A protein has these predicted regions:
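NAD(P)H-binding glycine-rich loop region in Rossmannoid oxidoreductase-like domains
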Residues: 1-41, 52-58
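Generic alpha-helical secondary-structure signal
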Residues: 2-5, 123, 153, 201
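Active-site beta-alpha turn of Rossmann-fold NAD(P)-dependent dehydrogenases/reductases
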Residues: 13, 47-50, 84-86
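Pocket-edge positions in alpha/beta enzyme catalytic cores
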Residues: 19-23, 112, 142, 187-190
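Soluble or luminal CAZymes and related metallo-dependent hydrolases
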Residues: 26, 30, 65, 190
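Short, amphipathic alpha-helical "lid/cap" segments that border enzyme active or binding sites
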Residues: 35, 117-125, 192-200
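A hydrophobic C-terminal alpha-helical subdomain
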Residues: 155-209
Length: 209
């Protein structure tokens, strides 16, 4: 009944737990339930937000769960579009927190192409408004950085004194990264908001809050 009359369903849900078994159970159960409800309601387009490189980071339980979600969607027989996004600017400080040991942040110097959440939502909406792709589209930010360099810039912008060091063995979502694990391919749709502009707008918003 909740989906009665809906033409499109957009799934941007996330697991409350990142423990391997729990996150897999969440994405498999929620996706199966959504797809079944959509079939009953006659929904014409299932759109799911996923992660660029999830299929390249197989040591990560979270990424394996996202791949499992994608496989369920692809095999469902329902019209679908999967939007794989790079990491959001907004999560940079959380990434730093999880990679912190004392006063030092350990991150690998691999390519990183983050984007603003506003650009993510715009891209997802455009896909939802169009016909089902029955495939995957990648989206990313307009700039590439070294992963460690980007987080160093973020902490500097907010006068965070933690030191960021390049560590090739530092893990991200439980896995070591290759040079291009986190960046989209050449056909990716790119956002418009540059990092410096996002920082400026974020500081203005914080002052106004």
């Amino acid at each position: 009944q909740v989906l009665a009359g809906a033409d499109v369903v957009v799934d941007v849900s996330n697991s409350p737990s990142f423990e391997d078994a729990a996150v897999l159970r969440f994405f498999e159960t929620s996706t199966r339930n959504q797809l079944a409800a959509e079939a009953t309601a006659g929904v014409k387009h299932h759109v799911a937000l996923s992660i660029v490189g999830c299929d390249r980071m197989t040591d990560s339980g979270y990424m394996r769960a996202k791949v499992a979600q994608e496989k369920l969607i692809k095999s469902s027989g329902r019209p679908y579009s999967i939007v794989r996004a790079t990491q959001f600017f907004e999560f940079a400080k959380r990434i730093a927190d999880e990679a912190t040991d004392g006063t030092t942040v350990h991150l690998p110097h691999v390519l990183f192409q983050p984007m603003a959440a506003q650009d993510v939502s715009t891209a997802v909406c455009k896909v939802a408004e169009g016909p089902p792709l029955n495939g995957v589209v990648e989206i990313g930010g307009p700039q590439q950085f070294g992963f460690d360099d980007f987080v160093r810039h973020v902490l500097g912008a907010y006068h965070d004194a933690r030191q960021v060091v390049a560590d090739p063995h530092a893990r991200y979502f439980g896995t070591e990264l290759a040079e291009r694990s986190l960046v989209p391919g050449a056909e990716a749709r790119l956002g418009k908001i540059r990092f410096d502009d996002w920082v400026s707008q974020s500081k203005i918003a914080a002052v106004r809050a």
